[in-house]
Amino acid sequence: MASPYRRDYRRSPYFKSTFKLNLYQKFRKYCLKYDEKTGNIIDLNSNKKALIFSFDESAFQFVGNYIKVISLTKPQLTTDTNRYSCKAAGFYSLTPEGKDYITFMENSTKETIKNLFKDIRKQNPKEIIFLLIDNFSSHKANIVKNLAKELNIELCYLPPYSPQLQPIEKVWYKNKRDNMQYKIDKIKNFKKMDKDEKLNKLKEIIENSFYKTVKSKTMWNKVLNEYIKPPIKKLHPRYNSEVKLEIVN
């Protein structure tokens, strides 16, 4: 079980209300209906499905911060003390039809973020995309916002200093916990590999762990029920009833 987030004095006491308002302003551009049975969100104006993704980057380091050794004799070093690190970017779908996606990158510049947006659009070519994203400087660059508008990607910025509202943070937490150093030591012939082979192997482990973790949709239930469903139902309550909508020309 993950430990709770510490209170950040920089975070506004109204961060939850701010997040709901941000989503409300994005959703009001469309005529969305949430299907309780399938979990899908549909825009009734265009008859397209709406997908909600949680997007963030994370750095992975494959050594522990410290190693405790208790021995009455001279201890034998069995751990690779070299540093191997890489940076991953992930799109975690909060809707059943969305295709989760993870990739690795060298930096987090605005050009890199633009390429990531193009990748997620290729993975989901026809749907409307709402992206939960933090306030990192590259995420708020004008060229990134302009590209998102061209690709029909709605950027839903989180309130500052509120990682608990970002579902993919729990995915990264579990991913790092599952790939601790003691498991890496068990990889066959790991010590005999060169640096590039080790990094490729570790990236493979991260990718497999990511797709395995995102199959469990319980991580985002709280965000979905508390923040995403209410604005949709508040904007268009009649579309969430049993009454069928008839359009008269």
Regions found by a protein language model. Name each.
Residues L51, I129-F130:
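The start of beta-strands in P-loop NTPase/AAA+ ATPase cores
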